[in-house]
């Protein structure tokens, strides 16, 4: 008989994600799992609130995601639904267009691996309603 361990989000050390003004961003928490400065890889968990959208942003490095719990919804800048990734779905992506993300009917937890990043370019950019960069995350 297998001894299965169930994911328990209460064991995660969640931190608020900082916004451009230094205040926590709405609807998102994060937990850094590993930062490998030699390989330029960041591994972290994000938790997005159910039925909410986080701030508009653009990925500036290659990344991969794995939906751990719930479903990850991504949206185009006009607010229309781009994709739904339920628990168990993996995606590898490259820098791309602005978008926003959020949870489905329950909070979503997503593993992100950002790789490789550089010391001079941002990992991602937070954007305002005019698609202007308001904060770069390095």
Each language-model region and where it sits:
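A short, N-terminal "cap"/entry segment at the start of jelly-roll beta-barrel domains
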Residues: 1-40, 126-138
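Short acidic-glycine-tyrosine-enriched beta hairpin
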Residues: 37, 76-103
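Conserved short histidine dyad/triad with adjacent acidic residue
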Residues: 39-58, 90-96
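Conserved catalytic motifs of the protein kinase core domain
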Residues: 41, 63, 107
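Double-stranded beta-helix
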Residues: 102-138
């Amino acid at each position: 008989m297998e001894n299965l361990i169930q994911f328990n989000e209460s064991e995660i050390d969640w931190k608020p994600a900082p916004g451009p003004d230094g205040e926590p961003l709405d609807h998102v928490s994060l937990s850094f799992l590993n930062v490998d400065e030699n390989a330029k890889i960041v591994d972290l968990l994000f938790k997005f609130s159910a039925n909410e959208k986080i701030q508009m942003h653009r990925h500036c490095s290659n990344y991969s995601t794995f939906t751990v719990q719930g479903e990850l919804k991504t949206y185009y800048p006009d607010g229309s639904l781009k994709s739904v990734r339920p628990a168990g779905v993996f995606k590898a992506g490259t820098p791309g267009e602005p978008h926003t993300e959020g949870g489905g009917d329950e909070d979503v937890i997503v593993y992100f691996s950002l790789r490789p990043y550089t010391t001079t370019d941002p990992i991602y950019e937070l954007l305002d309603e005019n698609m202007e960069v308001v904060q770069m995350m390095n």
